[in-house]
Amino acid sequence: MRPGVQALIVPSKKFKTVRIDVHFLKNATVAELAPRTLVANLLETSTQRYVNQIQFTHALSAMYGASFGVGAGKKGNLHDIGFSITVANDHYTGGQSLVRMAIEFLNEVISHPLASNGRFDEQTFARQKTNLINYVDSATEDKQFWASQQLRKLAFGANRIQGVPSYGRRADLQNLQNEQVYATYLSMLRHDLVHISVSGDVDEQKVLEDLAILELPERKVQLGSVITKFNSLPKPRHRVANQAVQQARLNLAYDIPATVVSDNFHAAVVFNALFGGSPQS
């Protein structure tokens, strides 16, 4: 589409729906995990046009119950804020272009958040920050999740990107300020690599024309490798924690010579399943 903004159109007649994904990618840092996660939560709930959840839901209902979501997470050494919407194929709507409506909706969500004067709406910001902290606190009650996080710290180190949960550190979440999070949003909007994918029974040229609706200026982006590696360890690290629970948890991590792009990736997946990494093991 333009420098720093990529589009992939995948025409397919297999489905009765069309899915549109917009991903904002940048090199991940520990300090930015918390504010970027909160940005995703804020953009998922309100905009200048749809100021509350009721109006937001009505907008989706007008597209015959379109499904929509925003998520934030790590992709190897990269961080991704992703927007996804799925609508019925235009062939089933009597000529109404739901694909164009969906792109207009995404543009409203991405480029016109409920904010003014360099700050998100105060009430919305406070609510979403509290909700995120409550989620983090409740997640630590999941013992399997807790054990997995302790293993990540052992394997990667507590202050490396892979040793920290995708939502960041709780202390960072607690200290987030409105202006800081809004600045993170502007940086995402202006500087992240944007990857857009559209899949379904669509006309490729028409979709590209509709994607021009998105207010995404060109940008120069230089991303590092998505592949992450362990630090070399002279001997295995161990941690044993005794807690008042009914079941014991055993989590293991191995550094193996395989990546998602290597020829032996599928062999590594089978190995992982055999060693307990799958319910089928």
Regions found by a protein language model. Give the residues of each.
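Active-site SXXK
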Residues: 36-44
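Short, polar/flexible loop-turn hinges at active-site or ligand-entry regions and domain interfaces
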Residues: 46-49, 90-93, 112-121
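Scaffold signal of the M16-like zinc-metallopeptidase fold and its non-catalytic homologs
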Residues: 133-190
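A common structural junction motif
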Residues: 103-116, 213-221
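M16 family metallopeptidases and their MPP-like homologs
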Residues: 8-10, 16-36, 53-108, 145-168, ...
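A conserved active-site cap/scaffold subdomain adjacent to cofactor or substrate pockets
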Residues: 247-249, 253-277
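Acidic/histidine-enriched alpha-helical segments
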Residues: 57, 112-136, 223-231
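An aromatic/glycine/proline-enriched structural segment found at the starts
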Residues: 162, 171, 187-259
